[in-house]
Amino acid sequence: MSCDLVEWKIESSPIDYQEAVYFMQRKVDSISDGLQKELVWLLEHPALYTAGTGATVEDLLASNLLPVYSTNRGGKYTYHGPGQRIAYVMLNLKTRNKCNVRLYVKTLGDWIINTLSHFSIKSYFNPDLIGVWVTHNGIEKKIAAFGIRIRKWITYHGVSVNIYTDLSHYLGIVPCGIKEYGVTSFKQLGVNVSYEEFDIVLEKKFNEIFSSFN
């Protein structure tokens, strides 16, 4: 399936988390029924925490700091908020003949790694610690988190990339259940980029990486 058939939707203001989940669930049904195109949805949320299907109470360190939403994506606790670019990806793995979840996650990783490389950020995918990582001043830190769900072989939820995120909000959780490593952002790495600049490269790299994902 050509990447030209994938719709791109970019939001200019923060989207309520529950509203976003409801939209994705309806979109999954429409894609499965052949009524709508696949979609990559770029947005940001107000400051909040989400608890994936693997979340444990011990990983929520400050329950009163921000709103907390339980969600059906994979993974544990993560933070979403201003300065973080979220890409919710709704693709039909069945029509792409790619009913392979591991391959899909790896392809997501390749997409983000190639995008970051454009901005001279060297990053890598760690299959044991899901997400995209960088080494900064000799310390490994996560710059992009993954959390996906697949229903009817349609993917949804997706990837969050820290651009100029307030990293102090991560102190209220154990991000993705990983105590040993921290998080970082474009800003902390000394890379200044706008959403507009990032989105252009993100779409370009998506078309390159996912062109063979069918």
Swiss-Prot record:
Its EC number is 2.3.1.181. It comes from Ehrlichia canis (strain Jake). This is Octanoyltransferase. GO terms for molecular function: lipoyl(octanoyl) transferase activity. Pathway: Protein modification; protein lipoylation via endogenous pathway; protein N(6)-(lipoyl)lysine from octanoyl-[acyl-carrier-protein]: step 1/2. The active site is at residue 176. Belongs to the LipB family. It catalyses: octanoyl-[ACP] + L-lysyl-[protein] = N(6)-octanoyl-L-lysyl-[protein] + holo-[ACP] + H(+).
